[in-house]
Structure formats: structure tokens, C-alpha cells
Amino acid sequence: MTIQTMQVGPIMTNCYLLCDEDAKVCALIDPGDEAERLEQWVARSGCALRYILLTHGHFDHTSAVRPLLEKHPDVPVYIHQKDCVDGQSGELLFTRVGPENQRYYKEGDVLPLGGLTLRVMETPGHSEGSVCLLLDKEHVMFSGDTLFRCSCGRCDFPGGSYPKMLSSLGRLAALEGDWRVLPGHDRETTLEGERRMNPYVRQGSAR
């Protein structure tokens, strides 16, 4: 397994390329901008693009989806159904994505990627349909805009909720053991570090 990070767009969104190099398959997580760079990135990996996975529907995590599909017309795009409307622009994400590509995931769904398995955890707060994507065996999570290093995502966009954010952070903190946390912005962190240092996680854990 390899995980690479590329920061894209004016808000420096972290897009992740998750590869199972043995099976030669990969997934793009939160392709927010700069589709041509991302396409070249996938090509250099030598892996076939199996999924495009979205932690939520905001423009800075989804804007490269449509141009990527022009090169990969058979690749499914996954998002939680509650986030198929962009909470910032009000734009329907899937007016840009044809019905042949759109897929919805929910709490507990699992997505196989070669020998890897991604599990979906619903984590509303930043948006109504925010999710985290968990590699349980490897203890790696893609936290989107739910959990950041010593912080959490904004809750003042349409569909956001601070009480729901705290509940989601409490659920993440309750995961067993330590985890590598790969957020939608800024540097990666660890769940154990956030349990100790993140005031929002500590508040969520106390609920």
C-alpha cells in the first residue's frame, strides 16, 4: 500500500492517491482542483483508477471530478447522498456527474481496493453528509474536513452543525488504538495526538 498527497487549488486541499501496488489499482480521494496534474499523477502510479471518493461535497474537494471523468468515463464517484448538493454554492454535484458514475455510500459501507478495504464512517458537522474513510487494518483514516491537526472543520456553512461535529469527533476519538489521520487540509496527524491536544476532540469525547 502507498498513500501519496498532492495539495491542489487555491485553498490547498489535500488530495490523496491510495494505491494497492500489488493489485495495480488506486483510488483518488477528494480531487478538488487541477485535474490535469491529478491525471498525470494517476498515470505515473502505474495503477488503474478504480474509484473517486469524496469526503463531502464542497467545491474545493470536488471540482476536478468532471474533467477526470472525461479521461476515466467508467470510474464510479462516491459521496454521501446528503452531500450531493454543494453546501457552499448550492450546486448539485451530480449535475456535473452522469448517473452512470454516481454512487452513494453510507455508514458501515465497505469498498474493496485490491487487498485493501475502506470503511465509511458518517461524521456530520462540517456538512450534513461528511464522512471519514477508514482503513481499519492499517489504522489510517482520511478525515476530510472533520478532523484537523489541533482543530476541526468549520460548522457555519449550510448543513453544518457544531453539536454534530462534536459528536462525530467523539466517535473518532473512541476508535481503538492510534491512527494515522490524513485531513482535507494542513498536515497529517495522529489520533492519539488529537485525543491529547485537540480541544474539540476532548470536548466531543466528554459528551
Where are the regions a protein language model picked out?
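Short Gly/Pro-enriched turn/cap motifs at secondary-structure boundaries
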Residues: 6-8, 102-103, 122-124
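Conserved S/T- and glycine-rich ATP-binding loop of Class I adenylate-forming
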Residues: 18, 55, 123
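Conserved beta-strand hairpin/beta-sheet module of binuclear metal-dependent hydrolase folds
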Residues: 1-45, 132-144
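Metallo-beta-lactamase
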Residues: 24, 86-93, 117-207
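Active-site HxH/HxHxD metal-binding segment of metal-dependent hydrolases
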Residues: 33-116, 196-203
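Short catalytic-loop micro-motif centered on adjacent basic/acidic residues
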Residues: 26-29, 51-53, 120-122
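Hydrophobic residues in well-ordered beta-strands that form the structural core
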Residues: 29, 77-81, 142-143, 183
